[in-house]
Each structure stands twice: as structure tokens, then as C-alpha cells.
Amino acid sequence: MQLIKNNEYEYADIILSSFVNLGDSELKKIKNVQKLLTQVDIGHYYLNKLPAFDAYLQYNELYENKRITSGVYMCAVATVMGYKDLYLTGIDFYQEKGNPYAFHHQKENIIKLLPSFSQNKSQSDIHSMEYDLNALYFLQKHYGVNIYCISPESPLCNYFPLSPLNNPITFILEEKKNYTQDILIPPKFVYKKIGIYSKPRIYQNLIFRLIWDILRLPNDIKHALKSRKWD
């Protein structure tokens, strides 16, 4: 909502690129996201409506350690929504030199959530151009969608035809001042209001922590004595 208030962004839908087979802990995180951002739609509900594609993704996630990028994920969502012609840009398979993202990714809040983004090469090894392409071809073959590239200089144009639409409009990047340059993280009191804690609430109880430390004390002493033996 802050982005809308600042006139920085407009959107029709916000869809979380979630995967149903990542375990209970991930599903719990997804539920927490729904609490924090009530307007978010959960992506794997859309994937369930493409059984063959969903099975293809789940197999590769579990057994081949492969995952599609979010841009390709949204192509699947568009397919579920009934779109037959998909006009793509921005899916560049990390082929861009320098920063592979459309934004400066080494920001404080981003790094808090994703420490790997502190590195220059932060994209995960589970993503690959080959797998993204195969997923797009799968959508074409099984669901009859047409995929077009709208940016002549994009790597996508090596694999999909340039859009036949003749659009004379040239996109000019508008330089803005004081715009949001990092992920917006809700203040701590918001998490408390909806019952999300960094640790279970019992661990924040002083009496519980005191009893817990007393119970652990003999074991800690034993380990300390063992370590002194080897000094």
C-alpha cells in the first residue's frame, strides 16, 4: 500500500509464487504472508488447475532440484486465467552483464530476509535458462498458449518470435526521486498483533527460560569438561 500512496506502482493482482511441496514450515510461512498482506493470492492454488504442469514442477523440485523463476511462474498463472497470447519481456535468464536484476539488490532489508543477496552473484543454482525454457515450451505444448517476445534485444527473442503487434510507443524510463529502494518490512508490533513471533512465545517467557537453562546446565558442564580434556 505504501508504494501506491507514493504513486510509485500500480497493480491488478499480487500473486505469491508458492510451491505446495516444500513442507509444513514453508506452508506456515505462506499463511503468515497472507496475514501480513491480505490482498495476496497464493500461486499454488493456480498451479493446481494445471495438473500436468504442476506434476512436472513438483517432480523437478523434489528429484532434480530445479525451480522455475517467478516470471515463468506468472506465465502459468496467466494460462490459468485464460490468456492465450503471452507477450513477454524481462525474462532474461540472468544473461544480463553486471547486475542480473532490474533493481539494486544489495539493500539492508533484502539482505535481512535473503542473506545471499549480499553477494554479487546471488541467484540460486536451482534456476537455469534450460529449465525456464522447457517450462515455457511445456505451457505451449500442453495448453496451447502462444508466447511472444516484445523486446528485440532480449535473449527471449532467440527462442520465441517477436510480437507481430506494431506498437509505435517507445518506453522511456522515468527517473524518480525519493522512491522506495528496498523491501518494506512491517514494524515488529504488526507481527505481534497477528501472532507471528521469531521464536515460539514460550521461549520469550523469563521463567521458562530460567528453568530451561537450569535443566541444560549439567549437560553444558559435561561438554565443557570434555573440551578441557583435549586442550
UniProtKB/Swiss-Prot annotation:
Gene3D superfamilies: Alpha-2,3-sialyltransferase
Protein name: Uncharacterized protein HI_0352
Lineage: Bacteria, Pseudomonadati, Pseudomonadota, Gammaproteobacteria, Pasteurellales
